[in-house]
Amino acid sequence: MPSLLGLKCLGKLCSSEIGKVPSPERASLRNSHRRLLIEDLSVPETPDPAHRRRGTVIHLVYLYSAGCGPPELRFSSYDPSVAHPQDPHHSSEKPVIHCHKCGEPCKGEVLRVQTKHFHIKCFTCKVCGCDLAQGGFFIKNGDYLCTLDYQRMYGTRCHGCGEFVEGEVVTALGKTYHPNCFACTICKRPFPPGDRVTFNGRDCLCQLCAQPMSSSPKEASCSSNCAGCGRDIKNGQALLALDKQWHLGCFKCKSCGKVLTGEYISKDGSPYCEKDYQGLFGVKCEACHQFITGKVLEAGDKHYHPSCARCSRCNQMFTEGEEMYLQGSTVWHPDCKQSTKTEEKLRPPNIPRSSSDFFYPKSLIRRTGRSPALQLLSPPCLTNSNKNPRQPTRTSSESIYSRPGSSIPGSPGHTIYAKVDNEILDYKDLAAIPKVKAIYDIERPDLITYEPFYTSGYEDKQERQSLGESPRTLSPTPSAEGYQDVRDRMIHRSTSQGSINSPVYSRHSYTPTTSRSPQHFHRPELLSPGVHRWSPLRTSSFSSTHSDSRPNPPFRHHFLPHVKGNEPSSGRNSPLPYRPDSRPLTPTYAQAPKHFHVPDQGINIYRKPPIYKQHAALAAQSKASEDIIKFSKFPAAQAPDPNEIPKIETDHWPGPPSLAAVGTDPRRRSSGREEDEEELLRRRQLQEEQLMKLNSGLGQLILKEEMEKESRERASLASRYDSPLHSASHAPSSKTSSLPGYGKNGLHRPVSTDFAQYNSYGDISGGVRDYQTLPDGHMPAVRMDRGVSMPNMLEPKIFPYEMLMVTNRGRNKILRDVDRTRLERHLAPEVFWEIFGMSIQEFDKLPLWRRNDMKKKAKLF
């Protein structure tokens, strides 16, 4: 009996219409994943052909949906009679299904995604490798990702709840929400689709919650208009800012026109971006000169960042509401200011500056009848000899200038005078100074009383009228008798003021504040027998009969021009021409001093170098005099070579001492010891004076150490000359030599930087040498202490730990007898062990950086 057709590999690809994937990039909840089931069916052979029947094969197709529970079962049927018998030529034409990932042919259960087929084990996530057949998946750039990896790499979080957003989303103001998370801030109700949302810059409000914000019916009626463009806000989002509603694109910066989406600053009802607001209305910090945003600290008319306002003393910031002192551009804490004042009181008193007296007297102007040019200007005097000696005084360290002199004939003029470094200068001297060298301290000259140099009284008017003086020319034409009378009166006046016939043609009056030597005046010699040189000019010095607020100057230079006949003394007109009979033609107004300048042939026509060059000349002159004094102490005024071996300083060199010389040694030694004791006493007094100025615990400690050392020195000096025979050649002097390298090594043990005295030769003259006697009774030739500090002779005082702590503000009270560099030394041993966990001896063995670090942690550094 013929057998039935055997179905060895009969199958059908089944699909569902629901399985259409709308998007190739993502399979969401609506997407279905198809599963293909290929079954091998075999029909048992039946010997009887009549028993052949039509059969129905049912295929189970699993339809998976992401997140929709268990897979759905779909049934599909087909008629096996339709299938062609399996013969070689039909089986070879069947297509072979290959896996898209591994490329192997698919047999059994396979998965189909769109047009691609996968083995079940090959369809996995690209990132984590998990099986995608049991859950939803996402397609990104051709890669298959699980839900967790896709959300982690490409997902968007809700701005309300912070979870990842899937499905329907709401986007507002650049932020994404779940539909249920985008709700009104006040009533917490979600916004329905198509509803209008009001954003006031901070909150999103619905229509019911935003309606009470309208303060008047007018505002309520106009609330639908944009404040920027004026048009009605219809559909879309509205922005509420500055109590107005705006389109999102109409809310712009008034200056640059940039759309404001984040923060803004309002000024006079207009919005600005931060950059433009700072450029137009910003306030800069006085410390860093940057614009201040946020909190600002105000001190007077100055503004600071809270982090920039720091105390100039302790460098700590000021807290809100804290008091401060403001001085110029520096600020202080009240406690720091008080401690500064305390330290200033402990310092040596500063020498007060000398007061600078400025006067603006009137100068007299005379015009001749021949030329309208001004001939002579009388310079001002430093004081007034006829008025009250009390003069207005201004304290200033530099120069001051006043209004310039008038050029109108007959009007009172004013010249510029200033006092710089105890020297009076006029305006031409000030003009000779470069601008970078001159410092002008402007004051109010109108507060100074102006007085003329010479106050004309009734008697002087009588003289001018008697001399025939006219108010226009001020040039008297006296007779011989009247002229002689005026001359005698002038000589008497000049003599009473301290100078007789002393013409001064220099315009530079020099008046220091202290007098060091008496004035010496020179009487000029006679030009010819019977003819005396006479000048109407007088010096600016005064006698003791006139009260003056300043002492006389130590030096005064007088320039005497040689006038012979009618020859002028310079290129200018001579103020006093002579007649052939050796008498002046027409004397000028002799009562007023007429100082004029005789130009030199050099470049500087003012005969005096500028101020900045005068200091160098004075310094060179002082150095020369110091060198003279220094070299006068050397034999033959020659300083010995420091590399040369010094000669033996004894009265008997090069021969041995005789008995007669030895007999005279005790007196000489006794006088030397007295001088040594006087020198030690003088040094001790000097040290005590310096330490009294220091007035600190460290200074008292140094003083005690020095006194103990000097007592040992005196004891050694008393027993130094036990052997009278060899004392002259081996006993060095205990005086400090000011000549290093000549007889002694010149090396001194430094006493202290606080009271070490320096002489003009540069060596220290406050220390006492430490000599140690050798076993044979001789003294060492050279002893040099290098890097050795003085021993601590006193036990440090014990203070509580709270008083020694260094806070951020510093100690409120400065403790006396405390070494600030070693605060830990003033702790009790048990307190020291409690803080540092070790003894003082163990602490000293640690390296310096370790000790400093431990002291910083304990607030003792």
Swiss-Prot record:
Isoform 1 is not necessary for normal axon guidance. Isoform 1 is detected in adult retina, where it is highly expressed in the ganglion layer. Detected in rod inner segment. Isoform 2 is highly expressed in adult retina, brain, kidney and heart. Isoform 3 is highly expressed in adult retina, brain, kidney, liver, skeletal muscle, spleen and heart. Detected in embryonic retina, brain, spinal cord, peripheral sensory ganglia and thymus. The gene is Ablim1. Binds F-actin. Interacts with ABRA. Its main location: cytoplasm. Residues 404-413, 536-546, 724-738 have a biased composition (Low complexity). Residues 793-861 form the HP domain. The keyword Phosphoprotein applies. Pfam families: AbLIM_anchor (PF16182), LIM (PF00412), VHP (PF02209). Residues 381-400, 467-478, 493-518 have a biased composition (Polar residues). It is found in: Cytoplasm; Cytoplasm, Cytoskeleton. The modification Phosphotyrosine is found at residues 417, 440, 483. The modification Phosphoserine is found at residues 216, 411, 466, 470, 475, 479, 496, 499, 502, 582, 671, 723, 738, 760, 789. One of its GO terms (cellular component) is stress fiber. Residues 673-723 form a coiled coil. Residues 97-156, 156-216, 224-283, 283-343 form the LIM zinc-binding domain. This is Actin-binding LIM protein 1. The modification Phosphothreonine is found at residue 477. Keywords: Actin-binding, Coiled coil, Cytoplasm, Cytoskeleton, Isopeptide bond, LIM domain, Metal-binding, Phosphoprotein, Repeat, Ubl conjugation, Zinc. May act as scaffold protein. May play a role in the development of the retina. Has been suggested to play a role in axon guidance. There is a cross-link at residue 704 (Glycyl lysine isopeptide (Lys-Gly) (interchain with G-Cter in SUMO2)). GO terms for biological process: axon guidance; cilium assembly; cytoskeleton organization; lamellipodium assembly; positive regulation of transcription by RNA polymerase II; transcription by RNA polymerase II. The keyword DNA damage does not apply. GO terms for molecular function: actin binding; metal ion binding.
